[in-house]
Amino acid sequence: MSSGGLLLLLGLLTLWAELTPVSSKDRPEICKLPKEPGPCRSYLLYFYYNSVEHKCQTFHYGGCEGNENRFHTIEECKSTCAA
């Protein structure tokens, strides 16, 4: 393979690595949990990590029970799950 072909291959691999989301196996387990508003009815605005769409999103938390995939701020969600 010529040096130009190797450079092209290296460039494509670098681009692929930059655009590929962090593998779900590298995320904490709480980030893999579904959003869970819980049975209460407080209607509090929280954030959760959507592992299908690979991003933090808002949801309304009822104020009790639920699971650990809930964050007060989008920054907290991103620093935990979207790194």
Curated annotation (Swiss-Prot):
UniProt xrefs under PROSITE patterns: BPTI_KUNITZ_1 (PS00280), BPTI_KUNITZ_2 (PS50279)
Site (Reactive bond for trypsin): R41, S42
Source taxon at top rank: Eukaryota
Disulfide bonds: C31-C81, C40-C64, C56-C77
Domain (BPTI/Kunitz inhibitor) ranges: 31-81
Keywords: Disulfide bond, Protease inhibitor, Secreted, Serine protease inhibitor, Signal
Intracellular or extracellular location(s): Secreted
Protein task: Serine protease inhibitor.
Protein's name in the database: Kunitz-type serine protease inhibitor vestiginin-7
Organism of derivation: Demansia vestigiata
